[in-house]
Amino acid sequence: DAVFSRQRYWGEPFPVYYVNGLPQMIAAQHLPIILPEVEKYLPTEDGLPPLGNATTWAWDSVQCSVVSNQLIDHKTIFPLELNTMPGWAGSSWYWMRYMDAQNENEFASQEALKYWESVDLYIGGSEHATGHLLYSRFWNKFLKDKGFAPTEEPFKKLINQGMILGMSAFV
């Protein structure tokens, strides 16, 4: 997905490996997938994203772990997705994590989400309208559709204080 996928190193890795060119999801119990160390954050010489430089970025479907690329046999060990999620993928639902920050089993319990519900007041500039607010609504609606978020909207009230365009006459 061109809107969501990034051809760079940073960002959350997609939990996807490929069998005969078809994407397969890594099961939730085997997450998170941690980005491997790489020496350079540039694309490969043949134009693959930076994760194409990683030497340990293959999925062992039997051991359910990330292994060396040299072990890829297309029978039980397969290549992992080389693109990553954009930076906003992990930062656009942060308020939900605050609701249950000590929870080590899920991003937040249903009890905490139902108790806290959505943010009472969000204050942000107009630059948020096509950035963070848009993505926050996307994630909230996605999580609501999947049964993880209790409310349709992430913020009850929004105050947009505007944007500074130039010098002020006030001292």
Where are these regions (language model features)?
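Structured secondary-structure scaffolds
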Residues: 1-171
